[in-house]
Amino acid sequence: MTPRNTFSLYESLLTFFLILDTGLSTEYQWSANIRSRWKSDTSPLVGPGSVSTIYEMRSRIGLYLLNGPISANFILQDSRILGAEDNYAGVANTTVSSFFHQAYFNFPYRDQLIQIGRFELPLGKQRIMSKNNWNNVGRSFEGVLIKEKLPFGEILIFSLPTIESKDIYHNDQKDTWLNGIYIKHGLSSLNNGSIAEIYSMDFQDSISTLSYSTYGTRVEAGIRTLMLESEYALQTSKKISANLASVNLGYKPEIDGFVKNIWLGYDFISGDDTSTVEMEGFSKYFGAGHKYHGFYDYIRHKKFIDHAHEGLREFNLKWNLDFLFETNLLVALHYFNSGDGNTHYGQEMDLIFKKIIFDGISLEQGFALYRPDNDDSILSFIYLMLTTSL
């Protein structure tokens, strides 16, 4: 977006807000969120004895509008690395532009709620379409979302174009789309919050051999002090055959104390077998990494965005503790292997401290130590994050 277009956007928004304040019946509510984060640089280019740090800031201002059965939500966002060259900090020049992270409206139709525009779309807590809040930008989709409440739970149907290829192919079959259905069912006979999820997604790529369907299910349930979180998903097409599996067993004491909960987990992501014609690597193209696989971005198992990777076989042990001064402490131990189990990547320990300073302001500090299996070095990652919400 050019500076001229940016000013035009702000002028239009200002005019719109003035109209809101001069008597229209539309109800509205403002919100704001600013997140500052300092983190260490884990690039292999950082030389021995050198220290490299990065300062990130993400600012969001939101406007929620309600007029009868119709509502709209706009979230304007600015994401930057402080001091980046294109910020022109301290220089009399234009800077990077803000953008709409979300901009959508809702309206009812019969028993459904229709949502159209640009929006976040995390499907529960599953691993295929996860909330990507760690990223300094975040992930938004564009398209149509249909929601419906049913006696047994909730159903979501979505159609999301991700790449429009008209400038190259002028052929709808060459566009990239993500279409799917997600069903959530509450398990009322078990602990509060217990749910079962079923989902089916179809990913249409401009290259037909990279198109595939994903079918999966996830359960999060508890019986008194015992908890289970498990997920299984299958990706299939003429050229792709991959799967993902996860089993996590937890214990939560009946009486609140120093230990909030303990989890023992196993995660599996299939890797590609180079001796076959098919691609067996499971793609988490829209998934999250830090949420499940530790905080250190070790290059050999950092992302699983395609089908050509080695996969992952991970064992982990996690404790959530009520630490000093009403601080929550997450302690996590990870043991990483390739999907076939033949290659040992390394071990990781995470210490994540979270504290609500007071209403609207929270502080988070994390330490991650990674020991690669192929040498005796200890790699480290440190971050400090302050979040303010209004």
Where does each model-flagged region fall?
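Acidic, His- and aromatic-enriched active-site or binding-groove loops in soluble protein domains
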Residues: 136-144
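Conserved radical SAM core fold
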Residues: 36-41, 121-128, 164
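Outer-membrane beta-barrel and related beta-rich outer-membrane complex signature
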Residues: 44-46, 86-88, 128, 169, ...
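C-terminal outer-membrane beta-barrel translocator/porin domains of Gram-negative envelope proteins
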Residues: 240-244, 254, 261-311
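Beta-barrel outer-membrane channel/assembly domains of diderm bacteria
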Residues: 22-118, 144-150, 155, 210-213, ...
